[in-house]
Amino acid sequence: MYCQTYGFNATEYSRTIPGHQFSEFVVRYALSLRCETNCSSRDIVTAIKKLAELTFGLVDNIPSYNTIDNWVRKCGLDEINHASQAFKDGDYAVIQDECMMIGSEKLLPVMAVPAKHQGRPLQLSDVKVVRFHVRSGWDAQTVSEALKESAESMGKAPSYVITDNDGKMRKAVALSSYTWHRDISHTLAMFMERTYMEDSDFQNFSNDVATCKRQNCMKEVAYLQSPSQRSKARFMNLSESIEWADRMLNTYHRLTKREREVFSFLPMHSSFIEEMKDMVSCIHYIESQMKQQGLSKVTVAVCERHVCTTIMRGNDRMRRVGQLILDYLAKESQLLKDGEVLNNSSDIIESMFGMFKYIQSPNKLNGVTTLILHLPVRLAFADGTASRNYNVKERLCKIKIQDVTLWRDENLIENQVVKRIWTLKSA
């Protein structure tokens, strides 16, 4: 039977994949649910059981949750093995970040993205995982070695490397003799932190907001409290708190007497809130230009003009941040060729590992496991059409579970939970 709407042969999909007990339809359905939804493997088993009841024979066998995860692991390993194919006809850039610490293990992923800006912000479907590196700790030398290994697996060196402002990342890129572009969001947040972190006005405002929230979190006015801030990298999400403060000031005269008493500290900080509002607005403008239009001499000039006409006309603190931004833009411009439009944002890495944190074990002793191989498959499915075009049969026939085990032994650290089980079992 041929489905004209989707362009596939249903009879072909119902056949068992060679060397497996399940049809291509079941495998494809399970992969789609695992990679395109938030379904757990156990939820998918339940969904396939219900599908078997409703389709009267289309589904013969029901896979276990571990079987489903093994399918994803195999496909993920194949994605890593063939990452270079996505850039065989074009240049690529590397995004690298020591982004996760699970237990005592630090994960250093190396991701490849198109070197040329695509006329839009980077999307998950643009990213290919080149390597996953895991160690108990990283320094500039080991990060540099990881970069070189990744370049060897890709068959050519990256056009440039995007990282945050971590000192060891900067040194590692220099040791590897690659061009380094600093992530725009981390860099601007760093400039804000340098200027405002120890500033008395900022500290007083932050303390008043925190005290108000702590004292009134369970009272009637709790619905008006400020949004929660990240404990780390707080200067990367200042906008929500500043927007809240600005809205509260604008609506202050409409609050009840009790509410005005609770938030009476806000009018005292009105000039500082207005200053921060202007700072956040300028930073968002620069980030939007760089992410939407790409890093080029044109966007650098546009951003420089905007800084000069906004925050450089403000007070001493604003001008200090403005000068840091102008110096940063000038250095980035020196690395560019005429007409060159590049990426300089690593925001995509936050989205990627937000997905992984959802499926990883809450037990920190597990560290980084082969579940990390789910990530390359989720990226492959990110464009929404892969569920129809993804060659499941070829990947499962090509990659064996022994290959996954070998990859684990070569790339991951010994699982502490397994070590604990075997140690206590032998007691």
Please provide the spans of the model-predicted regions.
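Basic, low-complexity segments
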Residues: 1-16
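Acidic/histidine-rich catalytic cores and adjacent linkers
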Residues: 163-175, 211-427
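A general alpha-helix detector
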Residues: 29-30, 355
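RNase H-like nuclease fold core
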Residues: 16-22, 26, 32, 36, ...
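Glycine- and acidic-residue-rich phosphate-binding/metal-coordinating active-site segment common to enzymes
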Residues: 187-212
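Short alpha-helical "recognition helix" segments of helix-turn-helix
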Residues: 44
